[in-house]
């Protein structure tokens, strides 16, 4: 799956996005089994998810990851070499600038880049590189961020296709974002205020695109404007394809394909830029002091890169395929179920994926419902799902599966899909009322309240209208069945998207319930019908231009 598609799914609730009580996500706390009582070594984490799991000791149920390197479910499992390096680093003290210099030199030797740096995650690396391009390593400028008054570099150019939720890291520096869509617009946008160009390494950054890295580099290099490529979810290429293709700096997530520390990022590229980026990073005071990276993560990330150069990548791929083969053979015995394996060749999210397909009318369950069943009940399994035109599917991503997971996953999917189910009702329950009109909603967030408005048009069971928040008005759609109302709106801004899913109950002129906002969790709402009517007014159309202003 392309990272762009993955980003679109971030606003959805984890797994399949259904509306379920949060209490169902947690295991019962085991008061007789604490971290200190057991000793950390007393807990086991394996593909079998035994009862003696460290998460269960605090009432949290672990997950088998067949979804990918999503941070919200843990990203990746660190390599054994990484854990050993982090453990060793924790036992002694070191001067951090000296450590950064040593790591920078070693990363250069390993990757062929001019220099290397470890940040507290990929986004932090993006933030520090942006600061470096704005300040040029001048601490007088650094301590004034995000107030860029008087700075000569204050703008970052981003192709429209590369705008995404992660470019908050760039915006945090206080720069002005300039969007472009064509090479001509890019050429026109570059000026003495341009600090850098940011490109996200998905399909729009490939050679056949108008704003590919190669094309951007041709335009940017005569102006000596640095290019930053965000390759967060990619496999590490040595020599690096992005640096060879014209990028000045490339950033990776440490906790994705490279299987380094979850809270680390890998930054490779021009030494002068990376030295300024390190200056902008913790432990140095300024806008990056809050992005602390410890000696443990720094050496753990270096160990992950060293391990990457020695790993048996073809052997890992073969193992992943064997796991998918086991699952496919098990579920293919169910009548109406077909399977296929997708082996991606692109650099991002590169691991085999098993697609399991069936007709909704035959098994009377959708892929999203299967994903919800697997994701919310023990043993929990995170998978992808989609339904279109009566066909539905689930997909199993192998990159972070662990030995033994394949057997549990095969049995779980088989048990769910092989159940006999009655056909789904095709008719919706009749609505209990007509709720067309304006509704004034009080939204209760975790620590504040907000006034919203819902303008509803009802056509039988179907609803459309507008949702007015504090800053924007967006389209809204949904249903009413009996007195149960479900609505959805999406607040879209360049680089951002927030999904509001309202689930409420109608009682007279009041709708109350919960709002599900995906990664932003939940809120409560109470909406009351606004029966106020505007006074009637006859409109006089002028016969010409105004005679006074």
Task: Say what each PLM segment does.
Residues 430-525, 533, 537-549:
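Central antiparallel beta-sheet cores of small beta-barrel/beta-sandwich binding domains
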Residues 9-10, 14, 31-77, 104-115, ...:
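Conserved PLP-enzyme active-site core in the AAT-like
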Residues 1-2:
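N-terminal secretory signal peptides
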Residues 96-101, 115-116, 288-292, 311-320, ...:
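Flexible, glycine/charged-enriched surface loops at secondary-structure junctions
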Residues 62-72, 83-89, 351-353:
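Generic N-terminal amphipathic, Lys/Arg-enriched alpha-helix
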Residues 54, 332-418:
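Conserved C-terminal alpha-helix-loop-beta "cap" of PLP-dependent enzymes
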Residues 5-28:
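N-terminal export signals
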Residues 72, 76-77, 83-84, 91-94, ...:
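Metallocofactor- and cofactor-centric catalytic cores in central/energy metabolism, strongly enriched
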């Amino acid at each position: 799956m392309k990272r762009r598609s993955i980003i679109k799914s971030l606003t959805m609730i984890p797994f399949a996005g259904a509306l379920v009580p949060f209490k169902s996500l947690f295991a019962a706390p085991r008061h007789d089994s604490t971290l200190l009582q057991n000793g950390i070594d007393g807990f086991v984490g394996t593909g079998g998810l035994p009862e003696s799991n460290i998460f269960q000791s605090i009432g949290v149920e672990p997950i088998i990851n067949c979804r990918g390197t999503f941070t919200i479910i843990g990203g990746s499992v660190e390599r054994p070499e990484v854990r050993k390096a982090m453990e060793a680093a924790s036992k002694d003290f070191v001067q951090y600038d000296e450590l950064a210099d040593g790591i920078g030199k070693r990363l250069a030797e390993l990757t062929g880049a001019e220099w290397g740096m470890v940040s507290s995650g990929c986004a932090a690396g993006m933030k520090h590189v942006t600061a470096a391009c704005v300040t040029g390593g001048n601490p007088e400028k650094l301590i004034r961020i995000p107030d860029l008054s008087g700075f000569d570099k204050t703008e970052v150019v981003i192709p429209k296709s590369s705008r995404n939720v992660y470019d908050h890291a760039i915006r945090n520096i206080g720069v002005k974002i300039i969007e472009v869509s064509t090479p001509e617009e890019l050429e026109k946008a570059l000026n003495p205020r341009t600090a850098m160009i940011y490109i996200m390494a998905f399909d729009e950054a490939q050679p056949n695109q108008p704003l590919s890295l190669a094309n951007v580099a041709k335009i940017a290099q005569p102006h000596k404007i640095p290019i930053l490529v965000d390759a967060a979810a990619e496999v590490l290429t040595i020599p690096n394809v992005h640096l060879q293709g014209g990028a000045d700096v490339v950033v990776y997530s440490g906790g994705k394909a490279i299987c380094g520390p979850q809270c680390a990022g890998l930054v490779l590229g021009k030494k002068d830029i990376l030295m300024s980026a390190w200056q902008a990073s913790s432990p140095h005071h300024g806008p990056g002091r809050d992005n602390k990276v410890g000696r443990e993560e720094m050496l753990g990330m270096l160990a992950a890169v060293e391990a990457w150069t020695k790993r048996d990548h073809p052997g890992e791929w073969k193992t992943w395929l064997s796991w998918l083969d086991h699952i496919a053979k098990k579920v293919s015995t169910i009548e109406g179920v077909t399977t296929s394996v997708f082996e991606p060749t692109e650099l991002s999210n590169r691991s085999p994926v098993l697609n399991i397909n069936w007709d909704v009318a035959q098994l009377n369950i959708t892929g999203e419902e299967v994903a919800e069943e697997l994701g919310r009940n023990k043993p929990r399994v995170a998978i992808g799902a989609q339904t279109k035109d009566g066909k539905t599917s689930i997909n199993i991503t192998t990159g972070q599966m662990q030995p033994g997971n394949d057997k549990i996953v095969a049995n779980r999917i088989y048990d769910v899909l092989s159940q006999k189910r009655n056909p789904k009702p095709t008719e919706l329950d009749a609505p209990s009322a007509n709720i067309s009109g304006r509704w004034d909603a009080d939204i209760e967030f975790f620590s504040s309240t907000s006034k919203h408005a819902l303008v509803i048009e009802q056509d039988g069971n179907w609803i459309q209208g507008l949702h007015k928040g504090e800053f924007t008005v967006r389209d809204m759609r949904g249903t009413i069945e009996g007195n149960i109302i479900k609505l959805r709106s999406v607040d879209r801004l360049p680089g951002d998207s927030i999904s509001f899913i309202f689930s409420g109950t109608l009682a007279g002129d009041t709708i109350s319930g919960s709002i599900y906002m995906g990664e932003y969790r939940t809120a409560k709402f109470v909406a009351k019908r606004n029966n106020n009517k505007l006074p009637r007014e006859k409109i006089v159309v002028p016969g010409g231009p105004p005679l006074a202003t």
